[in-house]
Regions:
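Extended hydrophobic leader/signal-anchor segments used for secretion and membrane insertion
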Residues: 1-435
Length: 435
């Protein structure tokens, strides 16, 4: 009893809610006084009485659900990489253990949920919003750093199209209008922060940083950021004729599904390569030239400006020439104008919960009061995928609020390739790979 009591007290101190200390009375009664039958479903057998196998299984299942749920909430949880936006650092089909204690676990904001599900079960929402808690994060080992892999709740996932749940509702509205979007993909669902889909990206800018992207490379506060080994940029690879051997490309670590080759072009118009891959491709005898694909202007300029945050034509940014952009930090105050409002309107209205409106004469009102400035209530981050030309990231939907941060990938415990059959679909070399 003493060991479990000490662990329980330490957990209560970490949680910071001392009402839970009353739980010590439950532990004491369960182990010592036995006044209340806390495990009411568990039958007590007389000597020689035959055990009920079904009740024993029920007891084991209930215990397992409680323990695993507790571990998932406060310590670590399993996730799967759904897309190629992080290749060649994290691969589609990687199954990860994500550490909640790295940055500190969030106290559940939506506690009524079906165990071992995130937001959907049998096509229906797997949670109830009857109880909603305010955002609170427990102490972690450290804060998010530049260059960290981060798992977070998708900020634009607050509103979801029932027919196309993986699509970005807000992007649809910007491109096609709200009425058409709802008619085509609706009805819509509104999800609380902790029940929005999980994304994993690399943090490239912290609260208070100024970020720029020049020639596809990231700069923070005027200094060029480290080009991490897994970062891929797109290149046009011209060959002397024909394809490059697929085995050669696979050995380089390329995802063949991302390579376009139709025989009418002398090579590959868009090949995602890390610096190491770039050096190797340049040595292939059939390769004539390798040139970076950089968007000075988007292909459908100027309409495509609407696809890049802050979704205004006067920004003039592309995915390879982006910013400078200041990342909001808690307690900082900015002057508000109609020109810079697109940068902060979702922060004010969606993430920090204020009523925001503008008038025809150019005035800005927050919670019914005219406002010329705004003080941020949370920290914000800027996330980008390592596969820089095949990643929907903060360049396309903006800042990631601190209350959306879930944890840090710690280890790949399984990795599978959906394009192959067992056992060739197992990436054995990635088993138990530390991230």
């Amino acid at each position: 009893m003493g060991f479990w009591s000490v662990l329980y007290v330490l957990w209560v101190i970490w949680l910071g809610n001392y009402w839970w200390l009353f739980g010590l009375a439950v532990i004491f009664d369960h182990h010592i006084t036995h006044k209340v039958k806390w495990m009411f479903w568990k039958k007590e057998y007389k000597e020689g009485e035959k055990r009920n196998v079904w009740l024993d299984w029920l007891d084991a299942i209930i215990f397992a659900v409680i323990v695993v749920t507790f571990i998932n909430i406060f310590f670590f949880q399993a996730f799967k990489i759904p897309s190629s936006s992080m290749e060649s650092s994290l691969f589609t089909g990687d199954h990860l253990f994500v550490s909640k204690v790295a940055f500190g676990p969030k106290v559940p904001q939506t506690p009524l949920s079906v165990p071992f599900t995130h937001n959907v079960i049998f096509g229906k929402e797997s949670y109830s919003t009857l109880i909603q808690n305010d955002y609170r994060r427990l102490k972690g080992f450290r804060n998010v750093r530049r260059g960290d892999y981060v798992v977070f709740n998708f900020p634009d996932g607050d509103t979801v199209l029932s027919r196309f749940p993986s699509e970005d509702y807000h992007a649809w509205v910007r491109n096609a209008g709200k009425a058409y979007t709802i008619a085509s993909g609706g009805p819509i669902k509104v999800r609380p922060v902790d029940k929005r889909d999980h994304y994993v990206k690399r943090c490239v800018a912290l609260p208070g940083d100024t970020l720029s992207v020049v020639d596809g490379l990231v700069y923070t506060n005027g200094e060029k950021q480290e080009v991490y080994p897994g970062i891929q940029l797109s290149y046009t690879v011209v060959t002397s004729g024909g394809r490059i051997n697929s085995r050669t490309l696979e050995k380089l670590g390329l995802n063949l599904e991302e390579l376009y080759f139709d025989g009418t072009l002398p090579g590959y118009p868009a090949m995602p390569l890390t610096q190491a891959m770039l050096d190797e491709v340049g040595r292939i005898s059939s390769v004539v030239s390798v040139e970076p694909n950089l968007d000075v202007y988007p292909p459908d300029y100027p309409d495509s400006y609407l696809s890049l945050f802050p979704f205004t034509e006067n920004a003039g940014w592309t995915r390879d020439y982006y910013g400078p952009l200041w990342i909001p930090e808690k307690g900082a105050t900015v002057a508000l104008t109609l020109e810079n409002l697109p940068l902060y309107e979702r922060i004010i209205s969606a993430y920090e919960g204020h009523e925001l409106r503008t008038t025809a004469d150019g005035k800005i009102f927050i919670d019914g009061k005219e406002a010329s400035s705004y003080t941020f209530e949370m920290d914000y981050y800027f996330m980008m995928g390592d596969n820089r030309h095949n990643s929907l990231d903060s360049r396309y939907w903006g800042f990631v609020p601190e209350d959306h941060i879930v944890g840090r990938p710690a280890m790949v415990w399984l990795s599978t390739d959906a394009g192959r059959k067992f056992p060739n679909n197992i990436r054995w070399r990635r088993f138990f790979k530390i991230v």
